[in-house]
Amino acid sequence: MRTQFKLICIFTLSICAAGSACKTIKNANSASKTANSSTASSKPDDQGIIHSATGTEKEKPAAGKSNVQGRVLFNSEPAPDIDVKLCEKFNQFLGGCQGQTYTAKTDANGEYLIKDVPPGIYEALTAKVFDTPYYVFATSGFIGSAKYDLEADQTFFAPDSNLFKNDLKLVSPKAGAKVPAQNIEVKWDSYPNAAYYKFSINADSGSGAETNYDYINKRIDGTSYVLDAPLKSGSYRITVNAYNSNDVKLAESPDDMTFTVK
């Protein structure tokens, strides 16, 4: 059975499934660079619009049209046979991609080319995550999705899209566990190709719990950590993320892992 995957946009992103609302999560800062675009394209302007980087066109767009060229990766390696979609409109709460859409599929090098689309502003550029209903935004360094400015007779060179799995196994605390406030051990299974990990423990303030910000995105080189400060009584949600040596996120633990401090 193929492992379920989720999507990634750099720094913070929205995870979406077709026909459903999105939920915001944190992720890694990618250090990878595409062979046919520069990192300049990954940063939006003050209007939230990403402009094309420079690169070598695979082919020229038809007169008056635009092409979109980019790459999809997993673990800093090409991800072939991935469906990519350019969306005229995007609503993260009402089904995602809307309006005119244009599609392509990545080749053996993880590269794609969406050909001959009308120029203008598009609200999403997504890559389907293998055989799951999830997809990723081609964005970097900011919150959420972005808009993309496609110019007539030009190829838009998009930021890399980096995929990650959601199969990192959290060993303790176990989901639904009730634990004492002192000496809580966070432990997880080693993940293939992971160079380091980050864990976050978020409080449900309605339960009386309080977030200790020392335990948000805390980097750990091993696979366990004993909290050096007690947690207040209440309910908490824990996530663990794995990163490779290029600071690219590989995987996260399931997002429904909660425990209670007695």
Tell me what each language-model feature is.
Residues 1-8:
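Bacterial N-terminal signal peptides that target proteins for export
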Residues 9-13:
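Hydrophobic helical h-region of N-terminal Sec-dependent signal peptides
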Residues 18-21:
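C-terminal motif of bacterial Sec signal peptides marking the signal peptidase cleavage site
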Residues 23-262:
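Long luminal/extracellular ectodomains of secretory-pathway precursor proteins
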